């Protein structure tokens, strides 16, 4: 009976792409747990995420002539040529943000001639966000970066434009500096602070008896009032 048959899967890969084989090939399983249409769609989406916009996927169920309770599903993936970047531009960035991005352009993760790659696009978002957050832009997040990819002008090529999303609030687009510095020390059993002490430009809130010298805490701070906010320095602290 078909619902209790075992099915194995294999893939016919044309051109390149062992990585997609590793994602989709599987050991024999009951056929009622296999959904080849979904797996074929997954393969198709993977191709597009890695720049193979002209790729195609299909499958075929092949019964075992020696055992009617066994079958094999063959997946065929035709990758064709990947789309590559023929131009990458950072556009419509505010002056200070544009200056930061251009000053660190050597660290970018996207290069002319590279294959289109969704994973790298997301990594570049993270890089730009970290760069800005380490230079005062406290409220900036990766999702505020927008991409526009044009594949019409040159067949097989992608003209990529990178910008900040329109309509972002001013709080996101301006750098912030460190103001008052407060350190909160809970008790041994996580009791909330009940007292405070001022040391230079730092306020320490503590519970019970202060068990550490203020200078020790102060010297561990990687920033001072008036410094531009830096996520990296905050994490080091």
Describe every region a protein language model picked out:
Residues 11-12:
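Active-site loops and adjacent core secondary-structure elements that bind or stabilize anionic groups
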Residues 35-54, 120-141, 232-237:
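Amphipathic, non-transmembrane alpha-helical segments in extracytoplasmic/periplasmic proteins
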Residues 24-30, 63-64, 112-113:
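A cross-kingdom feature marking solvent-exposed beta-strand/loop segments within repeated
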Residues 1-8:
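Single conserved hydrophobic/aromatic residue that forms the stacking wall/gate
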Residues 19-23:
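Extended amphipathic alpha-helical heptad-repeat regions
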Residues 31, 38, 42, 52, ...:
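Extracytoplasmic
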Residues 80-115, 125, 129, 138-237:
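Acidic, glycine-rich low-complexity/disordered segments
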